[in-house]
């Protein structure tokens, strides 16, 4: 009989070694909280979090098993940490950063995905933190949450607060992206990890009887734009199609994302954790009309457009939408490795 050992199998053993070392260093007055940063960064390697800059503090309240937890964490934002690691490597494609994501992995193999668009200061600007200490004493050699953990201010439940953090891997959608002739698109497909793939049109969205309205201000080419959009929430649309996750995997949906593609092949990825009501609860919208007249007959943005309220710039506002593909981003990463 042959046995195959994977890195995932070794994680608990490697992490025990790191924790023991951290205890020894702590006794000597040196704080040790190593995290592997891998994938598409300029300088991959193991980084000791207390040595990274700038140092940031976040006070948060979130639900853990339904119970409110409040704590104050110290660490470096995920965006700054990736820059410490040489920055995310990108191509010359327009807003290529929006096709990339980070997989955070704990010592037990638990994972959560973060889109780069969520944390990039030019877009979502969410202060997701990679923390190495806290006022409650849950982090450190003797803490129950390990040497490091993800902290996601604003999330309702703590599913994306990956504890016993061992690695952060930057991945990208397969290159090159799907080509497209551009132009006005009358509809989009919803496909991938859903039970009921479908064609999405303004008529099918209206028929759901779950339309909502969002007023958003964002930068387009450096110019502020304000518009009011009507559509159906992206989360509602995916749920209506039947998201296919594995109930045996804890918070499996946090490893999933949706890829929005325009008629010209332009793409942006959004993690499901960002929009799930129990977690990020961001009101991203698949819009079919707007007060500015850019959607619908005669509009330059086509029949459908992805709207991401709160983003500083409109890079994730994919217009002339032709595809919404739900993917297991962690599985896609294994295929590309």
Which residues make up each language-model segment?
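N-terminal intrinsically disordered, low-complexity segments enriched in P/E/S/T
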Residues: 1-337
